[in-house]
Amino acid sequence: MRVVFWNIRAGGGGRAAAIARQIGAWEADAVALAEFRGTPPSGELARDLARLGLPYQSTTADPARPGVNGLLLASRWPLRRLRLPCAPSEPCRWLLARVLAPEPLALGVMHVPNRVGGRKYPFLDAVLTTARRRWATPVLLVGDTNSGRIGLDEEVPAFNRIEDGWMRELDEAGWTDAYRHLRGAARAYTWYSPNGGNGFRIDQAFLNRALRPRLRRFRYDWGRRPLGRPASDHAAMILDLER
């Protein structure tokens, strides 16, 4: 089972068709997108994904606020939304669903706010509370967390003790960072600051104890660059699970 997460940047815009083609080339069974919007390009992207064999879809995008970033989850198998009182309270930035695949799992998608406005740390706390609950099934959490480990996921200092501590506490709660599990301390960056050009690994996937034995492969992928530029300013995550 192949799961792809990708922050597609501002709803995809004129890049939406290229994003769909790239996802098709990856042959995903489930795709989670951040910065999906209630705009015509995002809508066409969702329809393209359905044509690619991912017809079961759930989104947090709000058509009444088309410029607001949301999430999309598209799957080869039916989805059942899950709503937990302990989950983050920002409806556009959190989506949790059960994927009714032959080997079912719960899939949580997040786009953590940045530090501006004071929303980030309550969001991280809610994710951690959700992760610490007693899960009876395999669970995968994916997303753009705007967080990372100090000195490991950054080219220049950017992350603070709260963000680093959040990553550590997830690990202590039994959640495995898929990339670190397979690659150890190897460096990888999923986003580069537009001014300084410095790299940060802010897109991650976490598996609970029940799902970890099914992890087979994980990689970051910037996709094809037919015009010399990637289709998004974030690398995608491609995660392969044993069916």
Positions of PLM-derived features:
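Short proline/glycine-enriched turn/loop segments at secondary-structure junctions
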Residues: Y192-N195, R225-A231
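Short catalytic/ligand-binding loop motif for oxyanion handling, primarily in non-cytosolic enzymes
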Residues: G12, P40-S42, P66-G67, V116-G117, ...
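Acidic/histidine-rich helix-loop elements
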Residues: V3-G14, V116
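Metal-dependent phosphoesterases centered on the DNase I-like endonuclease/exonuclease/phosphatase
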Residues: R47, L52, F123-R209
